[in-house]
């Protein structure tokens, strides 16, 4: 039976059955980071959401049939400004932040994309597309800039579903006096005086660099062609970035529809407020790593809400995710779990526009099943379902022992446990209680067994 994957398409504003142009060559493009600052937890939501989408598409069509491109934006005004602020070179900054991004994605359990192109390596493709746009009267040169003529693009507002005046209301428009229309956006900008040479490139319009929007059009065209299946990114990219991508790509290649399905994940707030440096609530993934919050906890938190809905980061949400994972790991403890076929109800939840809250509930139900099972066979079946489902969404990649004792000095704990056992033999109950309380303060829980032994676990 043909698997039907329903995916919400921002372009049509409906859930559609995902039907790629070629089932043997499924193409997916996701906007990656601009590498000027360590990625924050909002960026990480996008990484995890599209990692899950990639896993689902692979499950349906096979790994060899799917090409996933996620770019690195390493040419941008923000990069120039931050490098100058830090007193480092452009390359030093972009290399450092790119490496940090890769560490963050590994920490969150994200698979590598098929291709990860850098904008600076594709300037020639950008120039070629800009030349096509000029030749077709969709772009023009003014004051050493190349601009895209927004009014020349059919259906410019299709993705955002707003009229042109609404879209630009309150938006700061640069160089409005030199443009044909205030809404026109830059395709190529000239180099500024005293600017770093490695952030500017030779072009038919002089030394300069590309605008942001042309970069993704060029890299998606290079690796996926004029038409591809999925384009993903955060909801904040719908306008202007994705709107402008569609306009310039369709105008450069008139027979192209560009991306067929547009997928956008919702915003992430911190304690109910928009994340910003001025509010002091700007949280990077590195901050979470330094707090020794396990990556699986953050990943489950990011999957706990439907990807299109807003998600609020707070201590309780992280603690809830940790408790859930503890529950799942406890459920499979001391059981010989085996990989089984993905349960039908679990897979159906993901095929319904990646309904991860329902998927998580189903895993919880299997965990409950372990604890109420009346036979060992039932326990094993439920535990095997837990690990199979959790692994599919990128979770539970450790043994229960590794999970509960992560970051613990086992030698130190075992020494104290043995010291406590000796104290109990000597009926030194005061010392035994002191050791238990000391370990409890360090979030180590002791469990005395009827046979006289003591086992321990991290809280």
Curated annotation (Swiss-Prot):
SUPFAM superfamilies membership: Anticodon-binding domain of a subclass of class I aminoacyl-tRNA synthetases (SSF47323), Nucleotidylyl transferase (SSF52374)
GO MF, any single term: zinc ion binding
EC annotation from Swiss-Prot or TrEMBL: 6.1.1.16
InterPro entries registered for this protein in UniProt: Cys-tRNA-ligase, Cys-tRNA-synt_Ia_DALR, Cys-tRNA/MSH_ligase, Rossmann-like_a/b/a_fold, tRNA-synt_1_cat_dom, tRNAsynth_Ia_anticodon-bd
Binding site residues for ATP: 277
GO cellular component: cytosol
Residues at which Zn(2+) binds: 31, 216, 241, 245
CDD domains per the UniProt record, alphabetical: CysRS_core (cd00672)
Annotated motif 'HIGH' region, positions: 33-43
Family indicated by similarity: Belongs to the class-I aminoacyl-tRNA synthetase family.
PANTHER family (alphabetical): CYSTEINE--TRNA LIGASE, CYTOPLASMIC, CYSTEINYL-TRNA SYNTHETASE
Name recorded for this polypeptide: Cysteine--tRNA ligase
């Amino acid at each position: 039976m043909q698997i039907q994957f329903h995916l919400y398409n921002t372009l049509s504003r409906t859930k559609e059955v995902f039907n790629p142009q070629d089932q043997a060559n499924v193409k997916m493009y996701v906007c990656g980071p601009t590498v000027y600052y360590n990625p924050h937890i909002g960026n990480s939501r996008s990484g995890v959401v599209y990692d899950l989408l990639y896993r689902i598409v692979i499950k349906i069509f096979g790994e060899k049939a799917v090409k996933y491109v996620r770019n690195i934006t390493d040419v941008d005004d923000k990069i120039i400004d931050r490098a100058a602020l830090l007193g480092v070179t452009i390359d030093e900054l972009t290399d450092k932040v790119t490496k940090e991004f890769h560490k963050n994605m590994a920490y969150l359990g994200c698979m590598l994309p098929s291709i990860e192109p850098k904008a600076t390596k594709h300037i020639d493709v950008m120039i070629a597309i800009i030349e096509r746009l000029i030749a077709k009267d969709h772009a023009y040169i003014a004051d050493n800039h190349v601009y895209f003529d927004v009014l020349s693009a059919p259906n410019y507002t299709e993705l955002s579903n707003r009229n042109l005046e609404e879209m630009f209301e309150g938006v700061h428009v640069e160089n409005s006096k030199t443009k044909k229309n205030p809404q026109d956006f830059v395709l190529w900008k000239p180099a500024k005086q005293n600017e770093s040479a490695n952030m500017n490139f030779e072009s038919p319009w002089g030394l300069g660099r590309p605008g942001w929007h042309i970069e993704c059009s060029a890299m998606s065209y290079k690796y996926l062609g004029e038409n591809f299946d999925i384009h993903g990114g955060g909801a904040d990219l719908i306008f202007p970035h994705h709107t402008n991508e569609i306009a310039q790509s369709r105008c450069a290649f008139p027979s192209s529809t560009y991306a067929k399905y547009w997928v956008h994940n919702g915003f992430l707030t911190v304690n109910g407020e928009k994340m910003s440096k001025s509010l002091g609530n700007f949280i990077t993934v590195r901050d979470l790593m330094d707090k020794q919050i396990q990556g699986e906890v953050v990943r489950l938190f990011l999957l706990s809400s439907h990807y299109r809905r807003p998600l609020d980061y707070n201590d309780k949400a992280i603690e809830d995710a940790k408790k859930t994972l503890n529950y799942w790991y406890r459920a499979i403890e001391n059981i010989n779990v085996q990989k089984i076929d993905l349960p039908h109800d679990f897979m159906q939840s993901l095929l319904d526009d990646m309904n991860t809250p329902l998927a998580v509930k189903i895993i919880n139900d299997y965990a409950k099943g372990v604890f109420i099972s009346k036979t060992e066979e039932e326990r094993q079946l439920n535990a095997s379902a837990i690990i199979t489902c959790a692994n599919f969404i990128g979770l539970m990649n450790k043994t229960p022992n590794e999970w509960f004792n992560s970051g613990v000095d086992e030698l130190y704990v075992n020494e104290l446990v043995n010291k406590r056992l000796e104290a109990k033999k000597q009926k030194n109950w005061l010392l035994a209680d002191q050791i238990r309380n000391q370990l409890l303060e360090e979030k180590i829980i002791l469990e005395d067994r009827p046979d006289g032994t003591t086992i321990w676990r991290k809280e």
